[in-house]
Amino acid sequence: MSDLCVGINGFGRIGRLVLRACLQKGIKVVAINDPFIDLQYMVYMFKYDSTHGRYKGEVSMEDGKLIVDDHSISVFQCMKPHEIPWGKAGADYVVESTGVFLSIDKASSHIQGGAKRVVVSAPSPDAPMFVMGVNEDKFDPSSMTIVSNASCTTNCLAPLAKVIHDNFGIEEALMTTVHAYTATQKTVDGPSAKAWRDGRGAHQNIIPASTGAAKAVGKVIPELNGKLTGMAFRVPVADVSVVELTCRLSRPGSYAEIKGAVKKAAEGPMKGYVGYTEYSVVSSDFIGDTHSSMFDAGAGISFNDNFVKLISWYDNEFGYSHRVADLLLYMHFKE
C-alpha cells in the first residue's frame, strides 16, 4: 500500500474506474466529492457496472462514509471545488474527473481546499500534459501543481507514435479513432447546436466527430508537433476503441520490422503501457484491458516501406483510468 492519499472529484465513468484502479494499485482513496450523487446511490453505482461487471469486493456505507472492502472513504457533495475539505480528509492529490474544471485556474481551486496537487483526467487548455511511457520524465514537482493525463485516445496514440518515430521517423501522419460512444452523446436524436451530428442517436449511427487527440501528441512529443492530425468516428459500442494511424516514414521499414520494434517496446521500456498481439481479436476482447495501447499486428497493412497503416486497441475507460493511477504514483515518487 502506497502512503499516497487521493481524493476524487466527480464520480462518473472515469471517477468510479479510477477508484477501482487505485484500489488495485494500493493507492489510498480517502475522499470523493460529487454534488449529484448521494451516498446510498454512490454505493449502488460503484457496486454495479454494466460494462465492467460487479465489483468483486464488499461495498457498503457506514457513518456517512463509503466503505469499500476495508477502506473508509469520506463523501462530500460540494458544488464548488474550493469548498471541498480535501485537507481535512487527508487527500494529498486530487483527481479532477468532472470534465468541468480543466484549466489551471479552475483546477487550482482544489488547492484552496487543502490538496497539494491535481491531476485532470482530460485534456487541459493550459496544464502540462503527460502520457505515461512517453513524457512523464518531464514532470517537475517544483513547478507543476496542476497537470493533465491527456485523453484516452492520446494515451493510445502517443506511445505508438513514439515507437514508430524513434525507430523510423514520422514525416507526417493521419489518425482516425473508431471510438465507443460516451455519456456526452444522445441515446436518441436530440439537440446539439454546436455540432449537429453529435446530437444523433449514439446506438443507431456511426457519427463522424472531431478530436484533438492527434494534435495533442505534439504536446507530449514536441518533434511531432504539426506532423499529426486526425478525426473520430463514434460507433455503437459501449466500450473499447481503436486507433488507426497512417504514417509516411522518414526511414524505410518493412511491416515485419515495424512489428518487431513495437513488440520490443511492449516487452521492454513500455511494458504495461503498450501491448502486442497477433491474435485475430475484436473490440470486446479488450474490455477491462489495462494497456494504454494494444498493437494489433495482424490488422495493420503496409503500402510500401515508407507508407503504413497501424492499428491499436484501447479500453477508453479502464485502460485510461489505470494511467491516471500510474501518473499519481509517478508524481508521488518524484516528490
UniProtKB/Swiss-Prot annotation:
GO annotations of cellular component type: cytoplasm; cytosol; microtubule cytoskeleton; nucleus
GO biological process, one term: neuron apoptotic process
Record CDD domains: GAPDH_I_C, GAPDH_I_N
Keyword Transferase tagged: yes
MF terms (GO), sorted A to Z: glyceraldehyde-3-phosphate dehydrogenase (NAD+) (phosphorylating) activity; microtubule binding; NAD binding; NADP binding; peptidyl-cysteine S-nitrosylase activity
Pfam name, any one: Gp_dh_N
Subcellular location(s) per record: Cytoplasm, Cytosol; Cytoplasm, Cytoskeleton; Nucleus
PROSITE patterns, A to Z: GAPDH
Gene3D superfamilies on file: Dihydrodipicolinate Reductase, domain 2, NAD(P)-binding Rossmann-like Domain
Catalytic activity: D-glyceraldehyde 3-phosphate + phosphate + NAD(+) = (2R)-3-phospho-glyceroyl phosphate + NADH + H(+); S-nitroso-L-cysteinyl-[GAPDH] + L-cysteinyl-[protein] = L-cysteinyl-[GAPDH] + S-nitroso-L-cysteinyl-[protein]
Ligand binding (D-glyceraldehyde 3-phosphate): S151, C152, T153, T182, T211, G212, R234
Site entry: Activates thiol group during catalysis: H179
Record keywords, A-Z: Apoptosis, Cytoplasm, Cytoskeleton, Glycolysis, NAD, Nucleus, Oxidoreductase, S-nitrosylation, Transferase
PANTHER family: GLYCERALDEHYDE 3-PHOSPHATE DEHYDROGENASE, GLYCERALDEHYDE-3-PHOSPHATE DEHYDROGENASE, TESTIS-SPECIFIC
Protein name per the record: Glyceraldehyde-3-phosphate dehydrogenase
Naturally occurring in which organism (per UniProt): Oncorhynchus mykiss
Name of the gene encoding the protein in the UniProt record: gapdh
